[in-house]
UniProtKB/Swiss-Prot annotation:
Residues involved in Zn(2+) binding: 92, 95, 165
PROSITE patterns: GTP_CYCLOHYDROL_1_1 (PS00859), GTP_CYCLOHYDROL_1_2 (PS00860)
Catalytic reaction list: GTP + H2O = 7,8-dihydroneopterin 3'-triphosphate + formate + H(+)
Biological processes per GO annotation: one-carbon metabolic process; tetrahydrobiopterin biosynthetic process; tetrahydrofolate biosynthetic process
Descriptive protein name: GTP cyclohydrolase 1
Entry's EC annotation: 3.5.4.16
PANTHER family listed in its UniProt record: GTP CYCLOHYDROLASE 1, GTP CYCLOHYDROLASE I
Source organism per UniProt: Mycobacteroides abscessus (strain ATCC 19977 / DSM 44196 / CCUG 20993 / CIP 104536 / JCM 13569 / NCTC 13031 / TMC 1543 / L948)
Segments passing through the bilayer: none
InterPro entries in the record: GTP-CH-I_C/QueF, GTP-CH-I_N, GTP_CycHdrlase_I, GTP_CycHdrlase_I_CS, GTP_CycHdrlase_I_dom
One Pfam family, short name: GTP_cyclohydroI
Keywords associated with the record: GTP-binding, Hydrolase, Metal-binding, Nucleotide-binding, One-carbon metabolism, Zinc
Family of the protein in this entry: Belongs to the GTP cyclohydrolase I family.
Length: 204
């Protein structure tokens, strides 16, 4: 089996990199396990395709999400910054099927008025979503990264998602959604501020 790619730094705390050959071999074994022939027409290239897809789906494992927030601007802005309805796709770590939906991210800059680019917030969501996840942890990781890098007065993150592990198997309830929130700083202490930003998030 070929050796995996190597990198001086890839941002993942275990130092792992994606092993294409090993992933392909695993998909072949899975096809055998479910009673398929991975060498038949239509499946011959599937292990390579699936491995490449997983490399993209789990790209967040190989980049340090905090680096996305390295570029900040001292704008002396001390009011709410809110980015709503950021589309996101993640993978349930229990069944390795998708959960997808939207993230709403709001923060109040700290005493220096430090802000980051709006696209950086969307990128942060992507990098934490693109790994085996549970929705509760995903929501908290986004909030905690903003606290670490921006030192804001308050952060609130709300994620709304449909889980295919609940829609296509088990209880089979397509259309059911799960909402999680992570609240930090001023939004945690001040119920009025929290209610105001939640109202803004939920408006269409």
């Amino acid at each position: 089996m070929n050796s995996p790619e190597t990198a001086e730094y890839n941002g993942h705390p275990t130092g792992h990199v994606f092993d294409q050959a090993r992933a392909e071999a695993a998909v072949r074994e899975l096809l055998y396990a479910v009673g398929e022939d991975p060498d038949r027409h239509g499946l011959a290239d599937t292990p390579a395709r699936v491995a490449r897809a997983y490399r993209e789906i789990f790209a967040g494992l190989y980049t340090d999400p905090d680096t996305v927030l390295n570029t900040t601007f001292d704008e002396q802005h001390d009011e709410l910054v809110l980015v709503k309805s950021i589309p996101m796709y993640s993978t349930c770590e229990h069944h390795l099927v998708s959960f997808h939906g939207v993230a709403h991210v709001g923060y109040i800059p700290g005493q220096h008025g430090r802000v980051t680019g709006l696209s950086k917030i969307a990128r942060l969501v992507d990098l934490y979503a693109k790994r085996p996840q549970v929705q509760e942890r995903l929501t908290a990781q986004i909030a905690d990264a903003l606290v670490r890098k921006l030192e804001p007065r308050g952060v609130i993150v709300v994620v709304e998602a449909e889980h295919l592990c609940m829609a296509m198997r088990g209880v089979r309830k397509p259309g059911a959604t799960t909402t999680t929130s992570a609240v930090r700083g001023q939004f945690k202490r001040d119920a009025a501020s929290r209610a105001e930003v939640l109202d803004l998030m939920m408006r269409t």
